[in-house]
């Protein structure tokens, strides 16, 4: 074999599933690399930094931003190599040596004995509103995510969308904003029942069968002053003065990496990796964790992603070293943490 920097496992994606994969592979003493398309670690949780996350076992309700901080710290425990701003565009295999070759959009090449795909819902970008000139307001008061609830305090906010995220944002903002409006093309909202009920009982003013047709700028033409709504049933228009506009029309995802792979990675619904409960794909040596993995009994929670990650790493370890233990030793009795535990205990007994 010619001289290459060969890793035991390369993890594509650095959300909760990818970061826990990195931690667990370090626990199993594997040479690990993480490749992330975004300029930072944490994945889609960054879209909801102030939303409370309740369903991670052992954690009290935690804001998304805090959860990111914790999972990043854990994921980097064993110092994996981290590559940010890197989009993997193809995966192939060296037929002579058996290792995988990952090529990026920049032309960089990575070599790995195994791969864990942990890209969540894929490379996501918010679906933009199709109104001429809308992009110029993106630097002022046209928003595609809610990064800070405080930013909207005492403001008049218009939200466009009727799914879970739009309803969540409306419920979160209604108590602190001056006024919240929500416009949706359909007759009724499509979110979870409890969230819809909460919104219906709040002071949020909903405009159904309606959509934004125009942004009216202020005198300096750098901010949205009001929005024009069209009711497609009555064909009537109305105008609402606003301070902020939030668009939540879903996300566009780039799934070309898997769809156009030269390897026989079987997909479900032309996107998700068809796998097993042990995180195995249809290609030996390629595993999956998190939302991208599909199998009967799949748990679509962050907690489920952690189990996927551990399974993927254990199978990757045994793929490389067939006589390796099926799982890592639990952390409470693992010698790898002996020195770290001494340092932590000193902090606790001060």
For the regions a language model picked out, list residue spans one by one:
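FAD-binding core/adjacent interface of flavoenzyme oxidoreductases
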Residues: 1-12, 27-28, 40, 81-155, ...
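Acidic, Ser/Thr-rich low-complexity intrinsically disordered segments
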Residues: 338-350
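Short amphipathic alpha-helical segments
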Residues: 22-24, 46-47, 127-131, 170-172, ...
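A Rossmann-like FAD-binding core segment of flavoenzymes
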Residues: 75-104, 109-112, 174-275, 324-331
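Glycine/Thr-rich phosphate-binding loops of Rossmann-like dinucleotide-binding domains
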Residues: 20, 43, 125-126, 168, ...
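Beta1-alpha1 glycine-rich phosphate/pyrophosphate-binding loop at the start
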Residues: 7-78, 167-193
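FAD-site-proximal beta/loop scaffold in flavoenzymes
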Residues: 130-153, 244, 248-303, 311
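A conserved FAD-binding loop/helix module that cradles the flavin
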Residues: 167-169, 292-335
């Amino acid at each position: 074999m010619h001289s290459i920097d060969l890793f035991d496992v390369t993890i594509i994606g650095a959300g909760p599933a990818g970061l826990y994969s990195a931690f667990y592979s370090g626990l199993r003493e594997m040479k690990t690399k993480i490749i992330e398309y975004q300029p930072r670690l944490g994945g889609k949780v960054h879209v909801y930094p102030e939303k409370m996350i309740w369903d991670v076992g052992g954690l009290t309700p935690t804001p998304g931003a805090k959860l990111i901080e914790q999972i990043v710290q854990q994921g980097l425990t064993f110092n994996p190599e981290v590559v940010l701003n890197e989009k993997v565009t193809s995966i192939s295999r060296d037929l002579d040596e058996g290792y995988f070759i990952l090529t990026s959009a920049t032309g960089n090449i990575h070599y790995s004995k195994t791969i864990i795909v942990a890209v969540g819902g894929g490379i996501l970008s918010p679906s933009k509103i199709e109104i001429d000139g809308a992009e110029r307001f993106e630097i002022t008061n046209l928003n595609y995510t809610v990064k800070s609830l405080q930013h909207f305090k005492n403001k008049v906010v218009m939200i466009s969308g009727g799914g879970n995220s739009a309803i969540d944002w409306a419920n979160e903002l209604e108590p602190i904003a001056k006024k919240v409006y929500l416009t949706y093309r359909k007759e009724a909202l499509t979110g979870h029942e409890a969230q819809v009920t909460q919104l219906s009982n709040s002071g949020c003013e909903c405009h159904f069968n309606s959509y934004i047709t125009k942004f009216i700028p202020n005198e300096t033409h750098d901010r949205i002053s009001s929005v024009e709504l069209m009711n497609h049933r009555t064909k009537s228009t109305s105008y609402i003065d606003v301070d902020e506009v939030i668009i939540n029309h879903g996300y566009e995802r780039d799934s070309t990496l898997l769809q156009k792979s030269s390897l026989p990675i079987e997909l479900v619904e032309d996107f998700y990796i068809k796998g097993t409960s042990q995180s195995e794909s249809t290609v030996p040596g390629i595993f999956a964790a998190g939302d991208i993995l599909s199998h009967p009994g799949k748990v679509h929670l962050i907690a489920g992603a952690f189990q996927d990650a551990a399974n993927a790493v254990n199978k990757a370890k045994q793929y490389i070293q067939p006589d390796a233990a099926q799982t890592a030793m639990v952390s409470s009795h693992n010698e790898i943490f002996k020195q770290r535990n001494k340092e932590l205990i000193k902090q606790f007994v001060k």
